Amino acid sequence: MNKEEINNNNNQLNTNIIHIGIENNNNLNEENNNINISTNRKNIFYENKETPIYFCSNSEKRIFLKCYGPESCAFYCTLLLFIIPIGSLNIFAFPKIKKKIWKIINFIIGDLIMLITLFSYFNVVTSSPGYEDLNKKITKNEYEEINPVIKIKNSTFKLKYCETCQIIRHLRSFHCKYCNKCILRQDHHCAYVNNCIGKYNHLKFLIFLICVDFYCLYCIIFCIVLPFKEKKKNLGLGRIIYLIVFALFAISMFLTMVPFTFSHIYLISVNKTTREDIKNELYDNVLNNGCCENWKEVC
């Protein structure tokens, strides 16, 4: 249905209720082709089941680091968690490796993994999760008159109104009290990246988690292998204790992050968010279009 057809229908209809029906295969049936629009309101039409035309804001990108605000402490602590481990290995462990070639290899690999992890971290911090368009504000009374409903497969959902942003929210959008914006397909707000994870940065967040997993794995392997390769007297008791404590810390981080990583791989594969999974929203997951199609939505 194009805009001209909608405008022609507007001249014939005098009702204040909008019913928007959208089938999973994007082909509107005869019943869903009837869109009733108030003659004194702008046309509100959904291009597909996922993103309303005037709600798209994927061009909005963040250019400044989010190193301020109520969660800046967690932001800086996360930075230190990445820099201190490899920095301490460079100072206390790498110099004790006898073979120069192994010393160089470990130095390069360790620092390279750290730099890649830091890059992926800043990529998430500075990315835009996707925001609702604030240029289309309406009042609560207008929202109640419109009463927008969206039908997906055999399930019907009423689109909610955000009283803070004064807009009709997309089906999977939620208002974040930290970002003070409505986030498209909000998964969760992550204090460690001081940013929301949403429609346009969920994949970046997953890549960051994978980098952290490899970072922890390298630290574990290095701390376990080094004492066996080098003589104890060369390392000294202090360094051995340091490596044991460091290995235990890396193992605890690894055991925490790996399940978290796989949980996000699973959620993307079935097209669910953390919020929907915890609150059991979207029962039977009507938005699941198959693994490949679900991954295309975040890529």
Language-model-detected regions and their locations in the chain:
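Membrane-associated feature with strongest affinity for ZDHHC
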Residues: 2-299
